[in-house]
Amino acid sequence: MKRLVSAFLAGAMALSLAACGGAASTSTVASSAASGSAAASASETAASDLDYIKKKGKMVIGYTVYEPMNYTDADGNFTGFDTELATAVCEKLGVEPEFVEINWDTKVVELDAKSIDCIWNGMTLTDDIMANTATTKAYAKNAQVVVVKDGTDYSSTADLVGKTVVAEAGSAGEAAIEGDENLAQADYVSKSVQTDCLMEVAAGTADAAVLDLTLANAMIGKGTDYASLKIVDELNAEEYGVAFRKGSDAAAAVDAVFDELKADGTMQALADKYDLALAD
């Protein structure tokens, strides 16, 4: 009998409390859910991404082989402008850089899956990249150029209508081809990396390649493996930046380090070493 009375009293108290406070509590939760769930989801990455990288003690950097940004030199050393710059930034942030070669066409997928923490590899700051990732400010200048074999008659992209033109899949070069009235009428073939594009033109299996000026300056012409190739046209001017996951606070942290490295002359020294122009 005592147990029944106790149960009855407990139930009554619960109903009383629910009547007094339940409506307000439910309203508050509903309001918070309606106004804050999206913000919480968006801010989760911003609040945790830099900490996530620091707790690991390393920044996993996605790259493709691309001289002068990330490549292995004649002595077997992994080097390049982006390699050295990323290493300097990581030192300032107190983490180690880990460079992982990626498929450029699926770079954002790998970023979102946390296979990598950032894309740092002469990456053009396109509208699409800036809409789908958290990017740093621009740190270097670039342009898309047309490369052909020496001796090729070329006056404009109109000469390439119906010809075989190559570019790296998912690259700014591919976008330049798609956006040019004449190049859009070429027989376009995508390649895995920009260096494959040079190989195709040198071998005569492609008539032209559209790729980064920075790479072309470093890899073609007298004294290079592609001495028979030349730049004949400059298309879109552009700038490079680093991409982190959308909403990440790591991009702002890297921007702050960029400011330090510009102020102390480190970035200019690297630009001079690799024959690049820093962004304004």
Label the predicted regions.
Residues 42, 47, 172-192, 227-234, ...:
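Ligand-binding clefts/hinges and TM-proximal coupling segments of bilobed small-molecule sensing domains
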Residues 91-92, 100-101, 105-119, 132-134, ...:
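Short helices/loops that flank or line small-molecule/ion binding pockets
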Residues 141-148, 213, 217, 221-259, ...:
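Periplasmic-binding protein-like
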Residues 83-92, 164, 171, 217, ...:
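Extended ligand-binding regions for polar small-molecule ligands
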